[in-house]
């Protein structure tokens, strides 16, 4: 089966979309699913914020060297599904591409643990839904 791609996009590509993509990829590998995720943002930070690095580290994941990337039209065109956090990535860069908006996600800067719980809970449901159909929209 062809590997299918989910593009997670948040404004800075360094917190919400990073949590989502890391979680999504971990679950997909654990369950041997043909899905992979990317992370990016239209205004990428130069580096991952300290509270995000610390939050990941507390969960045994090292993102200290991760460099946020600029969202690109070809990256989104290659995705089977776009999941955006409070930015119009799909509409701006890949009109007509299936997109889910998770705009109500709590700010990672306010409380990493609350945002982590929200995002990973949504990712679990997304993976379960995709696994049930074995394809993306």
Name the predicted role of every residue range.
Residues 19-25, 86-93:
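Short, functional N-terminal and low-complexity linear motifs
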